[in-house]
């Protein structure tokens, strides 16, 4: 038990150092990838981080004096930021209403649009090419264990990115995501949808930021279950095509700023 107690103290001290110091987040751009493949990959990373934490949790619950190395503990949970574009797909959150899907299966298949019920929060949304989909896999125990604050930070990343393009993004009370003119009745338009899942404070899923997205796909759903409000894109707001690489760089820079992290890249 003495070994277990020392490991728990070490785990708490290192977590404190992580909070005080700038943490590193491994960035991976997955390119164009099927939704299910990206979902499975997120689950793989999440479960690996949970496995690394599970030894410490078992010690805290008095499971014995198991000896572990710091290479197999919570001390080495790895943060990730994944960027991806998906072929056309509708995804429905676990609290979503299937009635917000306005297209039948036959027509959806004919148009080549996939459909998945997911384990994230939120309702129905669309993912497609020329949309920056970001999946942060973060251990919130090394940040703040507050889902609300985490969602607000994701929103802030996109709000700052819009500001880089001279666009005022904002929040809409009670509606997670990023909007333009949320207070102007009849002109409210959503530019970024957000839906996440956490397990043992490890996050997955994330945000979908419309850059040059084909907005016609949103005509066949009630986006996020919110009727009578529009969806927009960076292209539509600026009146021109936007360079995707440029937009990604801006999102990455603002992610580092808001979360106080440093993105690192694999060679």
Region locations from a protein language model:
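N-terminal lobe of the biotin/lipoate ligase/transferase fold
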Residues: 16-186, 242
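Conserved phosphate/anionic-ligand binding catalytic regions in large, soluble enzymes, centered on
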Residues: 202-210
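Solvent-exposed residues in well-ordered beta-strands and their adjoining turns
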Residues: 139-141, 197, 210-212, 237
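Histidine/acidic-rich helix-loop-helix segments that form or flank divalent-metal centers
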Residues: 191-194
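Short, Lys/Arg-enriched N-terminal segments with co-localized hydrophobic residues
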Residues: 7-19
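Acidic/histidine-enriched ion/cofactor-binding microenvironments in catalytic or ligand-binding pockets
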Residues: 196, 201-202
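C-terminal accessory segment of soluble enzyme catalytic cores
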Residues: 179, 215-267
């Amino acid at each position: 038990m003495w070994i277990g107690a020392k490991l728990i103290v070490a785990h708490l001290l290192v977590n404190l150092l992580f909070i005080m110091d700038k943490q590193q987040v491994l960035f991976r751009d997955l390119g164009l990838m099927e939704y299910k493949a990206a979902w499975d990959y997120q689950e793989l990373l999440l479960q690996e981080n949970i496995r690394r934490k599970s030894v410490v949790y078992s010690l805290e619950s008095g499971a014995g004096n198991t000896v572990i190395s710091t290479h197999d503990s919570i001390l080495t949970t790895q943060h990730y930021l994944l960027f991806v574009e998906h072929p056309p797909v509708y995804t429905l959150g676990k609290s979503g209403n299937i009635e917000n899907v306005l297209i039948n299966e036959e027509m959806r298949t004919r148009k080549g649009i996939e459909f998945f019920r997911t384990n994230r929060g939120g309702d129905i949304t669309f993912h497609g090419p020329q949309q920056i989909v970001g999946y942060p896999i973060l251990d919130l125990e090394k940040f703040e264990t507050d889902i609300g604050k985490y969602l607000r930070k994701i929103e802030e990343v996109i709000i700052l990115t819009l500001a880089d393009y001279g666009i005022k993004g904002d929040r809409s009370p009670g509606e997670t995501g990023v909007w333009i003119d949320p207070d102007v009745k009849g002109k409210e338009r959503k530019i970024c949808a957000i839906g996440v899942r956490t397990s043992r404070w490890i996050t997955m899923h994330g945000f979908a930021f419309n850059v040059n997205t084909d907005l016609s796909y949103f005509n066949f759903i009630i986006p996020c279950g919110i009727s009578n409000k529009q969806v927009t894109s960076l292209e539509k707001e600026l009146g021109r095509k936007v360079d995707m690489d440029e937009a990604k760089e801006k999102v990455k820079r603002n992610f580092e700023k808001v979360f106080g992290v440093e993105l690192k890249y694999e060679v």
